């Protein structure tokens, strides 16, 4: 048996073909959902039927805040991530009750991945999120560290959760650092050396 499984795949043909959300190709949408979310259900269902995961084992999938908030350009991937998180809750109850297996999703900062590079304006979103987050964007390596924590026995009673790993981005409405990008009248928030005092 195994102790943990990571689901980390996502792809949208609509995004790749630059189809807007109000002009989706539905065959492509089905592919988006199948690859990015339904595959998570298939993976868990197969593991359960094979009794492949040890008691208190851990299943983790990578999500994004666009599952719960509107992000222009994220397109049908937002729908896929919302489904992904729902699967974690629904299957998390069944697998937890019957085999004490944990299922969670991690909502990661914008990360410059192959899949992410297909999202229009990803570089600007990456910069904006970094300015908004008090701790800055979480890197891919830091996400891997967090996954290891979620695989470990230290989180044996954490299940059916969507856990934000985004430097605080999801809890910030507007940061001074982001405002300073657009508002040039914030000089009073600079120290004697001209550095912006982030609050």
At which residue positions do the language-model features occur?
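Hydrophobic structural elements of the Rossmann-like NAD(P)H-binding subdomain
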Residues: 6, 60, 103-106, 116, ...
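Catalytic loop of short-chain dehydrogenase/reductase
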Residues: 10-98, 107-113, 136, 169
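Conserved hydrophobic beta-strands of the Rossmann-like cofactor-binding core
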Residues: 2-10
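Generic structural signal for alpha-helix termini and adjacent loop/cap motifs
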Residues: 46, 50, 152-156, 174
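C-terminal helical subdomain
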Residues: 38, 105, 123-158, 163-167, ...
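Non-catalytic terminal and boundary segments that flank Rossmann-like NAD(P)-dependent oxidoreductase
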Residues: 1, 14, 27, 176-199
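Acidic donor-diphosphate engagement hotspot in glycosyltransferases and nucleotidyltransferases
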Residues: 115-116, 142, 174
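Short, flexible, mixed-charge acidic loops at enzyme active sites
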Residues: 17-21, 118-122, 176-182
């Amino acid at each position: 048996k195994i102790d943990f499984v990571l689901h980390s795949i996502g792809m949208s043909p609509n995004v790749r073909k630059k189809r807007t959300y109000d002009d989706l190709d539905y065959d492509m949408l089905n592919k988006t959902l199948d690859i990015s979310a339904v595959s998570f259900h298939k993976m868990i269902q197969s593991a359960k039927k094979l009794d492949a995961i040890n008691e208190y084992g851990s299943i983790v999938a990578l999500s994004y805040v666009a599952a719960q908030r509107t992000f222009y350009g994220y397109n049908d991937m937002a729908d896929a991530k919302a489904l992904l998180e729902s699967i974690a809750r629904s299957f998390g109850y069944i697998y937890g009750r019957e085999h004490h297996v944990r299922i969670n999703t991690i909502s990661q900062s914008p990360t410059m991945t192959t899949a992410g590079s297909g999202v229009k304006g990803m570089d600007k979103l990456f910069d904006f999120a970094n300015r908004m987050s008090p701790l800055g964007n979480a890197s891919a390596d830091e996400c891997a560290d967090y996954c290891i924590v979620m695989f470990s026995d230290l989180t044996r009673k954490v299940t059916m959760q969507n856990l934000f790993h985004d430097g605080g981005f999801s809890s910030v409405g507007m940061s001074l650092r982001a405002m300073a990008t657009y508002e040039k009248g914030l000089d009073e928030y600079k120290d004697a050396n001209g550095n912006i005092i982030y609050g």
